[in-house]
Amino acid sequence: MAKDTTGRLRVTVKTGGKRKLSSKLWLERQLNDPYVAQAKRDGWRSRAAYKLIEMDDKYHFLKPGLAVVDLGAAPGGWSQVAARRVGAVDGKGKVVAIDLLEMPEIVGVTFARLDFLDADAPEKLIAMMEGGADIVLSDMAANTTGHRKTDQLRIIGLVESAAAFAADVLRPGGTFIAKVFQSGADADLLVQLKRDFRTVRHVKPASSRQDSSERYVMATGFRGTPAV
């Protein structure tokens, strides 16, 4: 074991057998990530839970009694946080979640295995919600091709679809948060969000890996109807 720049012991993984270099690097990153270890100790499904916790601690949008939609929920870190903070675990608030992958049950969360981009997915989600939403969360990420420009366009297209859904289901004053990547390709998205919401900002939580271009667009104060 070696020490990293903070003085912590760093775990290294040997490449052997059928393990690819990319798998080795991913495993090393997981083993040396303090948020991964902390998530296990705190009972969160993933390190992503801390990103939502940080954002809510600062901006206070997850309030008791609110209804939340979590798009791209698996393995469930964000759904866990949302369910606790809006009181869904006690039947006060509501959390509805979907993902392409199966997700083990979480107390207070209604889950369906759905592809958000399927034509009938929004209708199914609305039926699950049994009413409007106060918050739409999206930690979805498109499959990457390795071609940077193509990947940027894919993720922006996914976020634009999530934003359009949010505009259909959010109650006035609602909040929309989605994962994006710093690229400059989201100019049109920001224009639309600024029409529909009173405040739009980019947020990069401390728990988001610093070597990643990942950040979140946070739109608050939904106007109720798009501004003309």
UniProtKB/Swiss-Prot annotation:
The keyword Cytoplasm applies. Keywords: Cytoplasm, Methyltransferase, rRNA processing, S-adenosyl-L-methionine, Transferase. It catalyses: uridine(2552) in 23S rRNA + S-adenosyl-L-methionine = 2'-O-methyluridine(2552) in 23S rRNA + S-adenosyl-L-homocysteine + H(+). Gene3D superfamilies: Vaccinia Virus protein VP39. It comes from the Bacteria. S-adenosyl-L-methionine binds at G76, W78, D99, D115, D139. The active site is at K179 (proton acceptor). It is found in: Cytoplasm. InterPro entries: RNA_methyltr_RlmE (IPR050082), RNA_MeTrfase_FtsJ_dom (IPR002877), rRNA-MeTfrase_E (IPR015507), SAM-dependent_MTases_sf (IPR029063). Pfam families: FtsJ. One of its GO terms (cellular component) is cytoplasm. One of its GO terms (molecular function) is rRNA (uridine-2'-O-)-methyltransferase activity. Its EC number is 2.1.1.166. Specifically methylates the uridine in position 2552 of 23S rRNA at the 2'-O position of the ribose in the fully assembled 50S ribosomal subunit. Belongs to the class I-like SAM-binding methyltransferase superfamily. RNA methyltransferase RlmE family. This is Ribosomal RNA large subunit methyltransferase E. It comes from Nitrobacter hamburgensis (strain DSM 10229 / NCIMB 13809 / X14). The gene is rlmE.
